[in-house]
Amino acid sequence: SSFYVAFRHDGDSSNMDEQVALDYLKYLMELPNLKVMANANFDLRFVMAEGIIPKAPFFDVLLAERCINEYRSSYSLGALGEIYVGEGKNEDALYEWCHQSFGGRKGRSQAGNIWRAPIKLVEPYARVDAELTLDIYNKQQVLIKQAEVIEIIDLEMRLIEPLLHMTAKGIRMDTDKLKSLGGELVVESRTLTKTLTQIAGRVVNVNAGRDIQRAFDDLGVPYPITDKGNPSFTADFLKSCDAPIAQAISACRKNTKLMSSFIDGAYKKYVVNGRLYAGFNQIGAVTARMSSSKPNLQQTPRDARFRELFIADEGEVLVGADYSQIEPRLALHYCSGEQADELKELFNKTPESDFYAILMTSAPDVERQTMKMVLLAQLYGQGEASLSLKLGDAVTGKRILGSFNSSFPFFRRLSDTVRGVCRTRKYIRTVGKRRCNYQGADSVVIHKAVNRLIQGGAADIMKKAIVDMWNQGVVNNTDFKLLAVIHDEVIITTSLKGDDLKCAMDELERVMVEAYPTTCPMHVDSNKGDNWWDIH
């Protein structure tokens, strides 16, 4: 049966002695037993805030469910309770009591007031949470075996510990530069607004379509119209339009976004004592890729002014290790045929080879970025007409595609094969044995199946690498500390110097390359520097 360890309830005489409660929590968290939880990273961060270091193993029923069925409309504890045991969470009465007692908005927004509620009111809800979590765990075990996802769920559960320690560290920020950059952007905003006003002959609201339309009409600048007859001033159009008015509006919008989204809305809001604490979502997308939030570090501009804000700990250096061209390499791993085998042999001999430079031999006049676009189009099911539009015209598009498929026909064959498997078997598995389900999927979803295979595999590789570097002691909590995982890159702060640093970086690369055996080897680039910009 469950019980509630109650302490720190505001003004409640039934509170357990705080030190006794914390000592008991410490005892539980340091046991080698399995800890079954729901949203483990969130709860364990509170535990760590009390100076308690929880020990693995952990099992998170919400993470497990994402591996069992990636298409649930909700992965909340209440939603899974309804699915597995026919019983969800009903906290309405508790939230209503808090609303009546403390005011504010109704519903879940009252969660922050629960500590102020009496123990006798909170205890039943707390016990239901614990009981529901265990009931779901027991029910899930049957489905885990049936779906044959034991291996990938084990990986996700072993990932909880290193990500927990990573999240708790935060990343040191150059707060002086942060303040200075905020001031620079304010001055820049005034200059850009003044320039726009001079071009338009009046003040223009860059977020009001009608106002922009009027400015364009006054200057006789053409603009696209939607099917419904409305003007369209998208970011892509403004960026591609050569008219000074379009460029000025685009610059103003970009400046505003940088100010609101990154300086005021992200960095300043989440920096505490000189460190930025971002949230990391272990399965942040249907592909199982990780994501970050509050703030989303993946959206940090590729701009020195912003990336220089992220700095190493005092007296240390940052190390960045980034998978090079992981998607095309993983795609080639799945390809077959004589031509594919020849390309694999080349990469096995020289793993550092530039994938896109090789692909460009099929069309020497094509730029690197265009060739990347062509490859992704072939893999991810983009039509010839759509791709030709991006390439400029149908004739050019057809020529480039023809040359590409003639030189590298195995990529198109891979795409066709994967879609065929989805239609017949109704699921595919990634390199880490992650199951991607297609039961009842429509043709549009199946058309993009290779995306799931490649993106899901890239997620598996990064996660396995993190678990391995943690378990093998390559990263630790002393002199080689993991700070962030952003796309295909890990960022580390280290006090190591000279040969010790070189050895650690070599080991980091080795672990990342060897995460999973692939017929086309992975390649990792690592660099060191004082800040995030330097390591690129």
Label the model's feature ranges.
Residues 1-11, 53-55, 72, 83-85, ...:
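Conserved "right-hand" nucleotidyltransferase catalytic core of DNA-directed polymerases
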Residues 26-30, 302-317, 471-476:
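A short acidic-Thr-Gly-centered motif at the start of a beta-strand
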Residues 33-40, 203-205, 322, 386, ...:
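Short glycine-rich phosphate-binding loop at a beta-alpha junction
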Residues 109-115, 161, 165-168, 221-224, ...:
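Conserved catalytic core of nucleic-acid polymerases
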